[in-house]
Amino acid sequence: MGHTLLKNFSTLVTAFCTGLFLLGGVSSDAKATDQPNVLMICVDDLNDWVGFLGGHPQTKTPNMDALAAKGINFTNAHCTAPGCSPSRNALLLGVEPHRSGLYPFYNLNHVDSESLSRFTPLPLLFRKNGYKTVGLSKVWHNPDNKYRQDEQWDEYRMYGTGKKDKSLIKDKGYHPEPFNKRTIACPASNPLTDFGDYNAAVHAARFLGREQQKPFFLAVGFILPHTSFIMPEANWDRFLDPISEPPIKANDLADIPQVGQSNAQIYVEIPVRRDNAWEEIRRGYLAAVNFTDENVGRVLDALEKSPHANNTIIILWSDHGFHLGEKRSFSKFSLWEEATRTPFIIFDPRNDLRNGKACSEPIGLINVYRTLCELTGISAPDYVDGMSITPWLKNSELPKEQPALITWGRGNYSLRLKDWRYNRYFDGSEELYNHRKDPYEWTNLANDPDYAPMIQNLAQKWLPKQEAPQVTSGRELYNVADADQPMKNVQSHQRFVKQYNKQRLQPPLD
């Protein structure tokens, strides 16, 4: 009993001292001995088409914009992997794919337990440290929401997925892709209570409105804007004007290695069935983003009105970005800017004198685990990769040399620096882009001999020296790289090219 009391007291003192050291003081509205709560908002497939990142001139995201203006807005943040499963596994386990071997999409319930036993899921770590942990909807990739569920969460509830939301629409004939029926852009007339993301937001708001007996870790996942783009009519109707297309170069792929093109699965989800399909898909994406912003607002408004407002750290991230025509792609699954760049915001009410800033240094989402640990005074496990980015909460202009590392399949890596991107694929082919002069990554400089020393230095200094073998599973894996299934993606890419040629849809941009 005495030992437990002493341990709890020590934890509180550590949290208090950590807050003072890192952030320079605690808000006078919060009790100094309160361990901070955490509200983690996880959005699916959200790219930079948000107001605070300026990705599209017609986007409407007032709630997320307000949060970005209130906290620290990391404008050069990047996912660890441009796919739902590997990105979330890396963030929630705190380990890079090249060290875990979790490269493709998994159902973690069917992975050999020995491959995962050395990792501690982030919610479980918080629960072991006295937090009440609550998970709502898509926090892990959907098949993994039951992974160690009873261990991780005091309370967990999964709401509707995109597949279920298809039942909301009566006209199921608009499948604009010739070979795939997943991408749909369509409003639904159903009441809000029929939408899973709305219900997740309402559940979170109810939780936040109640007094809690101990600090909480509340993770709220929103599935939109993941395909299918099905949202209430009110959100669709805000985007009835002609939709501006993003900057696109017709021959953009001419200097891209074949492995880069096939690895990105460029032709898998291109909507070309109708003449206006591209615009309709972009309209659907913007409307889906707008609906998600409303749901984020519901949660943030509830927190603001709650007794927890002055003692809750808010963190918002997306698992990766999304292409909407750039480089002929309407998906993620690439090592290019549209797929790797992600919204990322941290608001800590104890950081009041330094909040309201933007940070343009390269930040990887692999750093979320250590950062939340440091902000709450919890010790991170020794194996955890990344670093705490609390120094950039104190000084958003602090230079950062280390690039963000993005992995898409074993042997395929991207390094995102402040002004450069360097990609290297498993076969040795490369890409290099100067973002200061070429923000859309249209000119691959990798074959220019003037940049050979720079490429050599980047590769030697920052690319992984060792790669864990791909973890096996009791089920067939999705999105396995050609390094582990030779030529599969290349051959798939070639088949799609033939199909598009046969229907005279190739090339879709030139």
Annotated model-derived regions:
Residues M1-N8:
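N-terminal secretory signal peptides that target proteins for export/translocation
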Residues K7, F16-T18, S28-Y425, S429-E430, ...:
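Formylglycine-dependent sulfatase
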Residues F21-G25:
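Hydrophobic membrane-targeting alpha-helices
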Residues P449-D484:
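A contiguous, mid-protein "functional segment" used to position or interact
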Residues M487:
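Short, solvent-exposed loop/beta-turn-alpha elements that line the ligand-binding surface or hinge
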